[in-house]
């Protein structure tokens, strides 16, 4: 990996249906092998299922899910004096959003429902209700950070 230049941050266009950049980022997280239209179909279908099951606006449920899944702290490995320490650090705003979306999709894929749109809809609903795999991942991440609080002075 080259250390000279970091990749430029590209602007993401807002989703045409929900007019949200966050929805576009979720579509991009769902997308496999460049099949964006398939990812869009999955997400829109999942949002329709969310609307049917909760009788609420799917964007509100999705926003609540993202807010609940977003991590505040994480541990980063730092080598000091031949020993590796797990140092708790605050998560930057962009990484918070990225991790939340990644975890939602990751734990939706691990669910046992038949199709991805049902899995994603149920994971979004669970996350908005503070249950589910993505919430557990966030809690585990926070527990790790809390357990390694003694090494917080190694922050950089």
UniProtKB/Swiss-Prot annotation:
Keywords carried by this UniProt record: Ribonucleoprotein, Ribosomal protein, RNA-binding, rRNA-binding, tRNA-binding
Protein name listed in UniProt: Small ribosomal subunit protein uS7
Provenance organism: Mycoplasmopsis agalactiae (strain NCTC 10123 / CIP 59.7 / PG2)
Molecular function GO terms recorded: rRNA binding; structural constituent of ribosome; tRNA binding
GO cellular component: small ribosomal subunit
Subunit annotation: Part of the 30S ribosomal subunit. Contacts proteins S9 and S11.
Disulfide feature: none
Family that this chain belongs to: Belongs to the universal ribosomal protein uS7 family.
Pfam families linked: Ribosomal_S7
Record GO biological process: translation
